[in-house]
Amino acid sequence: MSCYVGLDIGGTKLLVASAEQDGAIIRRVRQDTPVDLQEGISLLHQMIAEVAAGRPIAGIGAAIGGPMDWQTGIVSPLHQPLWNDVPLRQLMQHRWNCPFTVDVDTNVAALGEYFCGGHDVPRLLYLTISTGMGGGFVVDGRIYRGAGGGHPEVAHQSVHSPFPRCQNVPCPCGSRNCLEALVSGNGIKALYHKPAEALTAAEWAEVEHNLAEGLRNLAAILLPDLIVLGGGIACARGQQLIDSLNHTLQERVRIVACPEIRLSKLGYDTALTGAIEISKRGLE
């Protein structure tokens, strides 16, 4: 009997899992991501063979950092500088002789939440808040894409903050006061000179205020039924963060319906779960 395989290709770790048709995971393995491209591709092949354990593979899905072209499967993840213009789909299909589907990790994670997170809504916005920040918007089971099939950069909206240290903050993208620069792990370290877990209650109040302002913008523009938060920062802060954001958004969102905010139930497996889903469903 055949199986499906999901790949979560990160800048520091590789996660690979095989699954049944219903998504139940059979085997999973984890390895550090090699810096060298050929070593990385070779290791992925070894991991796929390990989790498949001799069973035919019906499809492979992958989540990887951008930029990339999801239609051609050519990837150039920023956090893996030696992976430049890699024809990942071609390499995988040639080796495994099965359909291969790949997309930006936040899109894949959003699909994982949509199909496997227990949310019964047509429009779901998923945001990951970890070292960086990103998101994916799913409408009726399909990823929303911008002009030219582009990936909307929800974390690079400019946010007005009333706090002196959170004003005129440079972002690596070249702009200032981007949401990512105010609430991501890297942003928090730059602003507060400490990791998120060491913030005081007053400092967390600033972060939550800034995040709520960004979510208010997204609620007004995209009108999602639900916003799901994942990633290391959000998961570590947990329900305390969710309760604070829901309370604040109820006060700030006007004119449009206020979406509920939930914490991801998939934890750190959102992208891997989504990769398994697109190995079965594709992206069309």
Model-derived features with residue positions:
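Short loop/edge segments at beta-strand edges and connector loops
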Residues: 102-106
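Residue-level detector of high-confidence beta-strand sites
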Residues: 28-30, 78, 146
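A charged helix-plus-loop insertion that forms the helical arch/lid used to bind
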Residues: 73-84
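Short loop/turn microsegments at loop-to-beta-strand junctions
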Residues: 14, 64, 132-133
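Glycine-rich phosphate-binding loop of actin/hexokinase-like ATP-binding domains
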Residues: 122-179
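ATP-binding/phosphotransfer module of carbohydrate and carboxylate kinases, centering on a glycine-rich
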Residues: 1-59, 69-72, 90-100, 112-121, ...
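A cytosolic small-molecule/anion-sensing beta-strand core signal
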Residues: 58, 64, 139-140
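A short acidic/small-residue loop/turn micro-motif
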Residues: 32-35, 83, 151-153
